[in-house]
Amino acid sequence: MPSLSHESDSITLAADADERPLALRIAQALDAMREGRPVVLLDDDDRENEADLILAAECLTPSNMAMMIRECSGIVCLCLTTDKVRQLGLRPMVENNRSQYGTAFTVSIEAREGVTTGVSAVDRITTIRAAIAKDAGTDAVVSPGHVFPLVAVDGGVLVRRGHTEGSVELARMAGLSPAAVLCELMNPDGTMARRPEALSFAEMYRLPILTIADLVAWREIHG
């Protein structure tokens, strides 16, 4: 996988992500997903108004996972389809979900085998690989752990305009397993990165930017 260096010339960002044609932004994001590079995904300003780093679950490396942990909140979430969650036998984190946006956490997980404390970048990758394996069953992972699965609603961003659904949509559109990893992008002072900071971060690391609105528009056109 390519390194996450400032010098990568594969992406040219405008001052604002919306200034570039939608087809170009989508293509760059899907290329990044396939190549194991993060995508910066912004949700609606009147929703969480946050930026997440998104990686395809099957393309994780110690370097891109370490970047995610270092630059983000540290709460690494694995976005999965309802079928995959059912296959793993994961139950909801709570019976009565009262979160503002209905964020569908399951119980946290750890790989049953191959990890130590579960906290390191390598251990978290091991857990994620165990969970997304095609033949993974209810014995693939244990709870609690240091990876936090999220369940994407069926119908994706056309039903729920969330980072969870957007992440799974990106993986699927890239022709990859419909599973992705996300973590909320943060500023150095511990506050959440909003649109201006997210744009600056993406430009620094030459990362593609998309919004949930972009994905909704694309789905409405292309299905």
UniProtKB/Swiss-Prot annotation:
Which domain of life does the protein's organism represent?
A: Bacteria
Cited Pfam families: DHBP_synthase
Q: Which GO terms describe its cellular component?
A: cytosol
Q: Which InterPro entries match?
A: DHBP_synth_RibB-like_a/b_dom, DHBP_synthase_RibB
- Keywords tagged on the record: Lyase, Magnesium, Manganese, Metal-binding, Riboflavin biosynthesis
Where are the residues marked Essential for catalytic activity as a site?
H146, E184
Q: What is its EC number?
A: 4.1.99.12
| UniProt-listed SUPFAM superfamilies | YrdC/RibB (SSF55821)
- Which cofactors are named for this entry? Mg(2+); Mn(2+)
What this protein catalyses is: D-ribulose 5-phosphate = (2S)-2-hydroxy-3-oxobutyl phosphate + formate + H(+)
Which BP terms does GO give this entry? riboflavin biosynthetic process
**Free-text comment on the cofactor:** Binds 2 divalent metal cations per subunit. Magnesium or manganese.
Give the Gene Ontology MF terms in alphabetical order: 3,4-dihydroxy-2-butanone-4-phosphate synthase activity; magnesium ion binding; manganese ion binding
Q: In which pathway does it act?
A: Cofactor biosynthesis; riboflavin biosynthesis; 2-hydroxy-3-oxobutyl phosphate from D-ribulose 5-phosphate: step 1/1
Q: Per UniProt, where does Mg(2+) 2 bind?
A: E48, H163
Q: Which residues form the signal peptide?
A: none
HAMAP family membership: RibB (MF_00180)
Q: How does it assemble?
A: Homodimer.
Quote the protein name from its UniProt record: 3,4-dihydroxy-2-butanone 4-phosphate synthase
Q: Which organism is it from?
A: Cupriavidus pinatubonensis (strain JMP 134 / LMG 1197)
